[in-house]
């Protein structure tokens, strides 16, 4: 029973629509009606600006971190990665935003920030290298996921490898429209990096 409640709590934490809340507070807008229409950090940066976008990405990361920490904080015998995955699902399909959320990148990163902080730090560095080289946030996110799988092949943690592989596949799936735009050369590039 406690495990089920923890999973539900992790999902609810993940469901907190950071982009929607920050958009309303910072600019008085629903970011789902602007830019890509996505609740995630990339649309928040593009729609709300750097300050508000930074708040959104920090909140989205912290959702994953908090959810992964719940088993330790509440002394519930469940693997922290499972609680983290529940938060990622909540982020992508948020109960508080008509089940239309982000693309799972920042919240997945937050899970790894708690469970494998060194991996998280290297992921951030790799993401920015890819971003500098490609100028595509979406492609950088997907390539960072692939890097994460490769990293996990050298770590003796089968749970981490399985979860990272599933999350990366999910992130790539969530970016399928971006992949089409990259192929068609219509995906927007960042201009500030």
Swiss-Prot record:
Pfam families, per database record: G3P_acyltransf (PF02660)
Pathway where it operates: Lipid metabolism; phospholipid metabolism
Compartments, record wording: Cell membrane
Transmembrane intervals: 2-22, 76-96, 112-132, 152-172
Keyword Cell membrane: yes
A GO MF label: acyl-phosphate glycerol-3-phosphate acyltransferase activity
Reactions mediated catalytically: an acyl phosphate + sn-glycerol 3-phosphate = a 1-acyl-sn-glycero-3-phosphate + phosphate
EC numbers, comma separated: 2.3.1.275
Subunit structure: Probably interacts with PlsX.
Entry protein name: Glycerol-3-phosphate acyltransferase
Organism, scientific name: Bacillus velezensis (strain DSM 23117 / BGSC 10A6 / LMG 26770 / FZB42)
């Amino acid at each position: 029973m406690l495990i089920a409640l923890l999973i539900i709590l992790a999902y609810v934490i993940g469901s907190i629509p950071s982009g929607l809340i920050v958009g309303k507070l910072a600019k008085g807008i629903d970011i789902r009606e602007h830019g890509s229409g996505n609740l995630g950090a990339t649309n928040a940066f593009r729609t709300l600006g750097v300050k508000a976008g930074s708040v959104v990405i920090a909140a989205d990361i912290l959702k994953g971190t908090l959810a992964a920490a719940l088993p330790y904080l509440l002394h519930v015998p469940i693997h922290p990665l499972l609680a983290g995955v529940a938060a990622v699902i909540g982020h992508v399909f948020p109960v508080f935003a008509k089940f239309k959320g982000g693309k799972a990148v920042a919240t997945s990163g937050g899970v790894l920030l708690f469970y494998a902080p060194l991996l998280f730090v290297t992921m951030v560095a790799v993401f920015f290298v890819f971003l500098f080289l490609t100028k595509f946030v979406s492609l950088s996110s997907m390539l960072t996921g692939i890097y994460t799988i490769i990293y996990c092949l050298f770590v003796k943690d089968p749970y981490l490898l399985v979860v990272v592989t599933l999350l990366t596949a999910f992130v790539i799936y969530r970016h399928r429209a971006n992949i089409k735009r990259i192929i068609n050369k219509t995906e927007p590039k960042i201009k500030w990096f």
